[in-house]
């Protein structure tokens, strides 16, 4: 018998609005070696405009007086990165016109929405590369980041046709 926690986990769904993927503005992304404990919209561009310079071993900048060393990471060919934010269900339902709602229903059949289990996301920006920063040294090969970026080519190789010999 499943407990209520497992039942709740099974019900959780994330809905991505396809219309937000059509033409999001390009963005400049930076993966910093720190945590900024904010989970609300913030005018980052007003406070973080990096003065990036080319050093002898790569990119250099500073953040709050600390030296940062970085490298540009390119999204794998054939893919696009998106910045997504959560939208409230009430806002989403108000934004969609009949055509968008029908398009959404073709991609995802309508189901009963559950207040605490359904999350709605929309793309706010797109990117084809981003900068990874390390504190005072160029970041090493981050296993999670490298794994995520190499996965598409690995998946393509696994699923490719094998020539018969």
Swiss-Prot record:
Modified residues (N-acetylmethionine): 1
Annotated keywords: Acetylation, Nucleus
The UniProt record lists the keyword Nucleus: yes
CDD domains in the cross-refs: RNase_H2-C
One annotated GO biological process: RNA catabolic process
Keyword Nucleus listed: yes
Signal peptide range: none
Subcellular location: Nucleus
GO cellular component: nucleus; ribonuclease H2 complex
Role of this protein: Non catalytic subunit of RNase H2, an endonuclease that specifically degrades the RNA of RNA:DNA hybrids. Participates in DNA replication, possibly by mediating the removal of lagging-strand Okazaki fragment RNA primers during DNA replication. Mediates the excision of single ribonucleotides from DNA:RNA duplexes.
Entry similarity comment: Belongs to the RNase H2 subunit C family.
Subunit structure: The RNase H2 complex is a heterotrimer composed of the catalytic subunit RNASEH2A and the non-catalytic subunits RNASEH2B and RNASEH2C.
Protein name from the UniProt record: Ribonuclease H2 subunit C
Species for this entry: Bos taurus
